[in-house]
């Protein structure tokens, strides 16, 4: 374990870039006065899922998805050792003070293009309060902080470790084989995103090719294909929806336009009504659902967004992705809303009588307070006339959903909780049962109680549903799509038809990283057996660096699989070319297929 002290504050003249970016308060010494007590409450409800405000045991700096904020005021931007900042933050060239934090938090991705900090604090009072609280997070005088040392290479036999990934590798995680909580310590191992090394490889199964399809995308997230074959991409940071057009068999788009902009954290995209002739494009923003009139072939909207659901929840902090899909018959609109926290640490307690009354109105296992309408799949009608209600609860962060076009089943791809060690808790994809409770925050994977809520909800024992397909813990399961193509220049072999593909964004809360790949979930008549296979791997350079983070996956008009990754802002195209060995437009290692089971 390495010991060090944070760098002391020092004055640095901002670069011309920063002078332009930080146009408000850049020369001020302080932010507007705020209330630190209110700021602490706001932080706990909106920021604590990604940032720690305290040191750990033995003065260990606690890393989460975001850096520790202990000592942030007076610290040079991007300087905290052992946290892999984006290049944009590393190159800021100044020291954080309250004025700069106040401006940054107003709209992080606008103030510092390239940062992955997704959530603004738009309300000036809340922003002043949280900055006032951050100013209180000081390192005690005389204290030397410590940083966790992380391994560089795989030292064990875990088949989920990044060095053991290979197309065709099989995984079948089972609840009975899960470790106990805290069997290993909770690691803070964020990746450093680098440009693709000269020897970078992407591996796919024999017969497939993978090529770069598009680049220079800004924060590309979810991607969906319109019935006519146009490709719609949510660029969440800039607040816009991009559309690309391509010809069958082509390795690049022929058109690349911005369909709509000025949106607030857009992520989910859906075409309505279902079928070949949609009339609307729905977009799930951070805390609303809007739609645009649409005719097949439109590359740019000429209309203002129509608000369908003005507010999804009372709070927007924590997990910020929202998705929208429609039932197969088009009568219901489903919305996924992730939790505001890791495991509802600050949620106040209720009496058994209060819980019974609450669940009568909100559903079994529904959370309350700042977690109201969070960690749920919500449902209403496509016009938003019916009040939002819980379709399923206990789904910690259902990042994306998909409706099986054959069976009509609603599926969700979910990020589970952190902090219980490398081996807990599995992320998952699963069919969603109406009225179902999936465990968060009190239980996980069925009747496994989270020790951080021990004995809090004995009434929920044996009521949590075990998901269909358990993924390696901390994989960060993002978009999923069903493969239904039956023809086209790049169509996959028939045995892929009906299966699902899932993008795994990759771990941060694991000593040896995992994920950063595309997996294939095996289905028979729409029913999973719990197994998934590695399909595309190769984005990890070492246990410190990666050159891609998969987010979105969709099936193109010609049967190819299109993949977005938000590390370097690229899109990749995977096509099947009969009788050809797996290849990429990057050099590829021809290592033998590895099969691992668990």
Predicted features, each with a name:
Residues 27-44, 55-62:
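Electrostatic cytochrome c docking/interface patches
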Residues 41-55, 67-71, 99-106, 115-118, ...:
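C-type cytochrome heme c attachment motif
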Residues 95-145, 561, 566-567, 576:
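C-terminal capping alpha-helices of c-type cytochrome domains
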Residues 151-206, 278, 321, 339-389, ...:
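Beta-propeller domain segments
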Residues 212-217, 258-264, 308-316, 390-394, ...:
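Surface loop/turn motifs at the tips and blade-to-blade linkers of beta-strand repeat domains
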Residues 231-233, 279-283, 332-335, 410-412, ...:
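Hydrophobic beta-strand segments that make up the repeating blades of beta-propeller
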Residues 254-256, 260-266, 270-272, 279, ...:
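Asp-box/WD-like beta-propeller blade repeats and closely related beta-sheet repeat scaffolds
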């Amino acid at each position: 374990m390495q010991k060090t002290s944070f760098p002391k504050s020092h004055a640095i003249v901002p670069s011309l870039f920063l002078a332009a970016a930080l146009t408000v308060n850049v020369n001020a010494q302080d932010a507007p006065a705020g209330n630190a007590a209110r700021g602490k409450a706001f932080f706990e409800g909106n920021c604590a899922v990604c940032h720690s405000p305290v040191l750990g045991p033995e003065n260990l700096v606690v890393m989460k998805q975001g850096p520790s904020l202990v000592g942030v005021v007076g610290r040079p931007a991007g300087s905290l050792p052992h946290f892999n900042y984006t290049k944009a933050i590393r190159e800021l060239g100044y020291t954080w003070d309250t004025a700069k934090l106040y401006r940054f938090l107003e709209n992080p991705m606008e103030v510092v293009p390239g940062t992955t900090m997704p959530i603004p604090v738009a309300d000036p009072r809340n922003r002043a309060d949280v900055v006032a609280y951050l100013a209180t997070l000081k390192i005690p005088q005389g204290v030397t902080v410590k940083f966790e040392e992380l391994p560089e290479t795989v030292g064990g036999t875990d088949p989920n470790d990044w060095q053991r990934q290979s197309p065709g590798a099989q995984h079948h995680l089972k609840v009975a084989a899960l470790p106990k909580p805290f069997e290993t310590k909770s690691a803070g191992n964020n990746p450093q995103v680098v440009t693709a090394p000269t020897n970078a490889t992407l591996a796919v199964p024999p017969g497939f090719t993978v090529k770069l399809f598009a680049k220079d995308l800004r924060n590309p997230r979810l991607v969906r294909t319109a019935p006519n074959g146009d490709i719609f991409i949510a660029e969440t940071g800039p607040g816009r929806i991009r559309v690309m057009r391509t010809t069958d068999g082509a390795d690049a788009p022929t058109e690349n336009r911005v369909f709509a902009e000025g949106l607030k954290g857009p992520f989910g995209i859906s075409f309505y009504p279902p079928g070949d002739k949609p009339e609307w494009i729905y977009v799930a923003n951070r805390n609303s659902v809007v739609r645009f009139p649409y005719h097949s072939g439109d590359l740019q909207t000429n209309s203002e967004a129509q608000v369908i659901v003005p507010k999804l929840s009372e709070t927007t902090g924590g997990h910020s992705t929202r998705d929208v899909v429609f039932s197969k018959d088009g009568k219901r609109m489903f919305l996924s809303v992730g939790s505001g926290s890791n495991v509802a640490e600050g949620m106040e307690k209720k009496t058994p009588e209060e819980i019974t009354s609450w669940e009568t109105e909100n559903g079994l296992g529904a959370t309350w307070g700042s977690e109201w309408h969070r960690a749920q799949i919500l449902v209403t009608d496509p016009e938003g006339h019916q009040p939002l209600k819980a379709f399923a609860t206990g789904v910690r962060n259902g990042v994306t959903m998909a409706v099986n076009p054959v069976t009509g089943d609603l599926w969700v791809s979910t990020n589970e909780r952190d902090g219980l060690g490398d081996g807990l808790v599995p992320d998952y994809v699963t069919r969603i049962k109406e009225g179902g409770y999936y465990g968060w925050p009190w239980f996980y994977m069925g009747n496994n109680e989270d020790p951080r809520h021990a004995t809090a909800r004995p009434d929920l024992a044996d009521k949590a549903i075990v998901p269909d397909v358990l993924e390696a813990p901390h994989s960060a399961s993002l978009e999923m799509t069903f493969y239904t193509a039956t023809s086209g220049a790049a169509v996959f072999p028939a045995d892929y038809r009906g299966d699902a593909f899932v993008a795994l964004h990759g771990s941060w809360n694991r000593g040896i990283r995992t994920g950063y790949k595309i997996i294939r979930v095996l289905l028979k008549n729409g029913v999973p057996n719990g197994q998934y296979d590695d399909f595309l791997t190769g984005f990890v350079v070492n246990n410190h660096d990666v050159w891609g983070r998969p987010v979105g996956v969709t099936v193109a008009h010609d049967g190819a699989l299109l993949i977005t990754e938000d590390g370097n802002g690229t899109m990749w195209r995977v096509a099947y070319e009969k009788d050809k060995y797996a290849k990429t437009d990057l050099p590829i290692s021809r290592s033998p297929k590895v099969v691992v089971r668990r």
